[in-house]
Amino acid sequence: MLKSLTRHNIPKEHPRDNSLKIRANLSDSFDNGIISQFGLIAHGRGEAFDYILGETTPKISLKTIHVATAQLLLSDSVISVNGNSAALCAKSIVQLANLTNSKIEINLFHKSKTRANKISQLLKKHGAKDVYGLNTKYLTKIPGLKSNRKYIDKRGIFLSDVIFVPLEDGDRTEFLKKMNKTVITVDLNPLSRTSAMSDITIVDNLVRVLPEMIKQSRNMSNLSESDLQKIIKKFNNKKQLNLILKYMSKRLIDLST
């Protein structure tokens, strides 16, 4: 059925039009070697949490997006890209990188040179000039991390202050923090290790987050460094996660009555 929908266009009248288009895109991206089979599983897990959010961005998450955008504008930052984020939002990633003067670096858990090159080509198709994380000459390791995501670019993540890692895994977040990096993540699961360990956790769907960050980057581009610092200083990630958990709990209670 998914292949049929991909070929014949999903009708706009379908109540889950956007979700089906995303699934079809991911299915095609798997066939094209952009994402791994594990990426499909990860997306399904996230989609379950998006149902609880009502497939909309809560006001609580909008506040976190505001803080995350301020942090990117203020810092020497890198957007870390994996297969799913590239498949879902390659164009938006490039736009956000340009607006915030962030570097783009590919980092894969299920490492494949072929897949990394395909992701790079996709990003460059949407206007990316430099994509880091491909040239083994410049790769180094995150101290202590054992998975394939330990490899980072000396010119990118290694040098940067802030790492924006949508769809991240908890292990790498932990070790990036040990390197004194500020970690921003997008995770639909507020209970994950990544959510708990990151400095700024946006609980929302990446396909909604990035367009909002692009919008806010444009709106905030003229703010002074001190104004951006004030926005960040007031933020408490643990408090925001507690608020989003309460929001999701209330949603479930309301739906059950």
Model feature map: region roles:
Residues 81-91, 110-114, 168-171:
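Gly/Ser/Thr-rich loops at beta-strand to alpha-helix junctions
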Residues 75-82, 103-108:
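Short glycine-rich or small-residue beta-strand-to-loop segments that form or flank ligand, phosphate
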Residues 170-191:
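A short, gly/pro- and small-residue-rich
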